[in-house]
A protein has these predicted regions:
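Flavin-dependent oxidoreductase catalytic cores
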Residues: 9, 13, 30-38, 46-296
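N-terminal chloroplast transit peptides
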Residues: 1-23
């Protein structure tokens, strides 16, 4: 899909929206990608108890290939299997709600521990309460995740509806910037945002740029994982939200051009390694695969 479509998309990019420097842009080349080889140790004890050295180096480069955080899929068992298959792919946890971390401090290992062999691994958290997001990041810090990601893309009714977080956070970029600042202040790992290209009728390229600009200029966030579909918050299922909204890769490649000091990982509709390679060749800093990582 991507291999045949991505070059025409590049030729039809939207007009430049924000080609302005961000506050304190990182001074590093994006031609290089960080690649970490997992530990050869056979120990299965948690990273909290073993003071595992982090796989992320300074400066931080986004992973070239990663497996998306997926509820009911990317648990410890799946990640163990995935790590046996690939030593270099970045793995993500299922989303863990900030309140769960804060209110389950007597049983944090259940939600946050992982075998050291799973490095490099990122924790995805969700929430809309600044205080709880701060506390959750601080509590997770001792588990030595390689990155922490904020969920701004989940469209499910339970998350974006009653929970008022996930994709709904895209409607409030000021809050997202504050949340990312709070998370970054309470952890040692790099931080990132996973988002859609829009929400409901707020789906123009200029609105997407406004979100990215406000979050990046108001927080330490320099890495965005962009699912190239908008989210529909009209009650349809998460599965339908992965199929009904059309993919708009031109939005993703527009961000690459208009925000040269930021890092962008492409997500959505990627089904094979040839499509991953095509996206990288066309400038994507990284590619995240979701359903294809368990369907094939």
């Amino acid at each position: 899909m991507i291999k045949s479509a991505v070059h025409p998309l590049l030729a039809s990019l939207p007009p430049t929206y924000y080609s302005i420097p961000l506050k304190n842009p990182p001074s590093r080349s994006f031609n290089r990608f960080f690649c970490h080889s997992s530990s050869s140790s056979s120990s299965s004890s948690s990273s909290k108890n073993n003071n595992v050295k982090k796989s992320v180096q300074d400066p931080y480069f986004p992973p070239r290939f990663s497996v998306a955080p997926m509820m009911d899929w990317t648990d410890n068992h799946y990640r163990t299997l995935a790590r046996l298959i690939s030593k270099h792919a970045w793995l993500y946890t299922e989303m863990v709600v900030a309140e769960t971390i804060v209110h389950k401090q007597d049983n944090l290992d259940r939600f946050l521990s992982f075998p050291r062999e799973q490095h490099p691994i990122a924790l995805q958290i969700g929430g809309s309460n600044l205080n709880n997001l701060s506390k959750a990041a601080a509590l997770a810090n001792s588990y030595n995740y390689d990155a922490i990601n904020l969920n701004c893309g989940c469209p499910s009714g339970k998350v974006a509806g009653h929970g008022c977080f996930g994709a709904r956070l895209m409607l409030n970029p000021k809050f997202v910037a504050e949340a990312m600042s709070a998370i970054a202040e309470n952890c040692d790992a790099p931080v990132s945002v996973k988002c859609r290209i829009g929400v409901d009728d707020h789906d123009s390229y200029s609105e997407l740029c406004d979100f990215v600009y406000k979050v990046a200029s108001g927080s330490p966030t320099r890495h965005f994982i962009v699912h190239a579909r908008k989210a529909l918050l009209n009650g349809i299922s998460p599965a339908a939200n992965r199929k009904i909204p059309p993919l708009k890769y031109e939005y993703f490649f527009g961000l690459l051009r208009d925000f040269p000091s930021l890092q962008f990982t492409m997500n959505g509709g990627v089904t094979c390694i040839n499509e991953v390679d095509a996206a990288i060749q066309c400038g994507a800093h990284g590619v995240m695969v979701g359903r294809a990582a368990y369907n094939k």
